[in-house]
């Protein structure tokens, strides 16, 4: 797939949009164009058949055996009605097919970018959560509008080609006005093009800022209220909303301005057509009416074409953002289920690991990870604990990795195979399922209600399985949500469980009780716990301390 160039021209966006279509849908686009062509032919023919109904003495260019001047008005009306019905049915069929294509296109874009994010390396995603939310939601809508505009451009192009061809067939002299008008229309289509792209870029950026204001709103609201900054928050949100309003209004103004230019050109063209007909002797009145009807059919398409071009330009920055996330580096594919070895009792000996960032990095050496043990990772905030545990969880590749199992050296991909069946719970993650049962079944699809109740007792959560997680009357506290997520870990029975400050909402005694229960219930699991509380060291088999002065980590045996 080709990567879109920021600020690229309309032809580049068109090429990139088409490149995202799979082959079956390209064939369906071809069918859509064919239906549009048939619809345009039927519509143009209906316009010509209207002439003898308006002026009975007019002669049609295709008069012959099946249609001639001596036909009764009833037959002429029947022919016009039949062709008009065919036009309506063909246009309806094309519209239905186009709607299905647009729907599938949006679905595919969302699935593709979501799948790419699921497979992406953790590092590049750390500081862009609001932008990611935008990419997964509204941004795709803008791109889909661009794809729908592309369909409308195809219809307009086919209709214009058919109408102009038939008009030339009916009366070639009258079409002398077409070339200069076409040149003027082409020039008009370029008006405001650069500004439209700039407005589109700003609109996408402002929408991302709006997502920042909306992200995790309850926690944000507590923070704002505690600092007494409600007025500042309202002002900041209002500023973003105003920028969005101005951007949206400017987009509509640009569309309206372009439409006005095209309508003025159309009025001038029709007036010029009548002047030409009066001055050019020998032009049949019926031919003049037919040409006017054929060209009149193009007026709404001229207006919609301008709007479609503007929508395509607005979609360009949104499509560039989508493609930027589609080019994120991905982590290596997880090993097959049959290729996941169990961590041996002797453990995995990590002889040397270098993690960066943070700069200058973290150096870890001589640490053994054994099943059934609890490794405590401590250190000041922001010093790199999460970066280290990302590596230990197999989610982020280190700069240097030197390890062995049973005396045999392994690389990081082999290490990932050992720890792939894992569980990772961080402090900020919140369950998105509807009920307690749904949350537990997500972690253990084959689990029973009895198993779910038992594991809830183990973590000290006294809640019914049907308790709603997001209902105002039954919302769980922060500590209860953490207990629920830890229950997921027990049901998972992972090879490695990483708890990155996942017990911070519990008091010290509850934290020790829950961790003790997890260690008891998971005798074959390695627990890696990040915590600021010194008391957790009493449960730890090994402690890793990230020092504030030098970023060299020396694991020490707990209690040593």
Task: Label each residue range with its predicted role.
Residues 19-26, 122, 138-146, 150, ...:
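An intracellular "coupling" helix at the cytosolic face of ABC transporter transmembrane type-1 domains
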Residues 32-38, 152-202, 272-286:
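Transmembrane helices of ABC transporter permease
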Residues 229, 253, 298-328, 334:
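Cytosolic ends of transmembrane helices, especially the final helix of ABC transmembrane type-1 domains
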Residues 393:
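Helix-to-loop junction immediately C-terminal to a conserved catalytic motif
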Residues 429-471:
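Conserved "ABC signature" C-loop
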């Amino acid at each position: 797939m080709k990567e879109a160039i920021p600020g690229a021209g309309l032809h580049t966006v068109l090429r990139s949009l088409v490149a995202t279509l799979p082959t079956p849908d390209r064939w369906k686009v071809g069918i859509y164009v064919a239906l549009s062509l048939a619809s345009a032919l039927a519509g143009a023919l209906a316009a010509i058949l209207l002439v003898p109904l308006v002026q009975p003495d007019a002669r049609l260019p295709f008069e012959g055996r099946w249609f001639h001047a001596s036909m009764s008005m009833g037959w002429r009306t029947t022919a016009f009605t039949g062709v008009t019905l065919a036009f309506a049915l063909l246009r309806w069929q094309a519209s239905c097919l186009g709607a299905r294509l647009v729907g599938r296109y949006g679905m595919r874009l969302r699935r593709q970018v979501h799948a790419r994010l699921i497979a992406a390396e953790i590092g590049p995603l750390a500081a862009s959560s609001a932008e990611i939310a935008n990419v997964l939601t509204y941004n795709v809508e803008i791109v889909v509008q661009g794809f729908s505009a592309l369909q409308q451009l195809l219809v307009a192009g086919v209709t214009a080609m058919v109408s102009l061809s038939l008009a030339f067939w009916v009366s070639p002299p009258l079409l002398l006005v077409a070339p200069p008008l076409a040149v003027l229309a082409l020039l008009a289509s370029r008006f405001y093009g650069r500004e439209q792209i700039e407005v589109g870029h700003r609109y996408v950026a402002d929408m991302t800022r709006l997502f920042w204001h909306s992200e995790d709103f309850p926690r944000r609201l507590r923070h704002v209220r505690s600092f007494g900054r409600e007025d500042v928050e309202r002002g900041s949100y209002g500023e973003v909303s105003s920028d969005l309003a101005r951007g949206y209004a400017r987009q509509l103004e640009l569309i309206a301005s372009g439409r006005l230019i095209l309508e003025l050109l159309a009025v001038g063209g029709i007036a010029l057509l009548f002047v030409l007909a009066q001055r050019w002797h020998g032009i049949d009145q019926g031919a003049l009416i037919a040409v006017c009807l054929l060209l009149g059919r193009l007026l709404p398409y001229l207006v919609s074409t301008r709007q479609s071009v503007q929508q395509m330009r607005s979609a360009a920055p949104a499509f560039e953002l989508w493609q930027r996330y589609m080019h994120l580096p991905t982590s290596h594919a997880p090993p097959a289920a049959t290729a996941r070895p169990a961590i041996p009792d002797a453990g995995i000996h990590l002889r040397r690991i270098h993690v960066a960032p943070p700069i200058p990095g973290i150096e870890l050496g001589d640490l053994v990870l054994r099943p059934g043990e609890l490794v405590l990772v401590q250190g000041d905030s922001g010093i790199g604990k999460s970066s280290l545990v990302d590596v230990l969880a197999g989610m982020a590749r280190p700069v240097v990795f030197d390890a062995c199992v049973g005396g045999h050296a392994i690389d990081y991909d082999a290490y990932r195979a050992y720890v792939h069946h894992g569980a990772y719970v961080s402090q900020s993650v919140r369950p998105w399922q509807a009920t307690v049962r749904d949350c537990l079944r997500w972690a253990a699809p084959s689990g029973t209600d009895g198993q779910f109740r038992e594991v809830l007792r183990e973590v000290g959560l006294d809640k019914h399985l049907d308790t709603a997680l997001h209902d105002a009357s039954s919302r769980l506290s922060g500590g209860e949500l953490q207990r629920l997520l830890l229950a997921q870990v027990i049901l998972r029975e992972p090879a490695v469980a990483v708890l990155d400050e996942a017990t911070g909402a519990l008091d010290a005694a509850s934290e020790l009780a829950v961790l003790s229960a997890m260690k008891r219930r998971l005798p074959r699991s390695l627990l890696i716990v990040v915590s600021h509380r010194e008391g957790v060291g009493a449960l730890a088999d090994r402690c890793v301390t990230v020092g504030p002065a030098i970023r060299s980590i020396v694991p020490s045996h707990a209690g040593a």
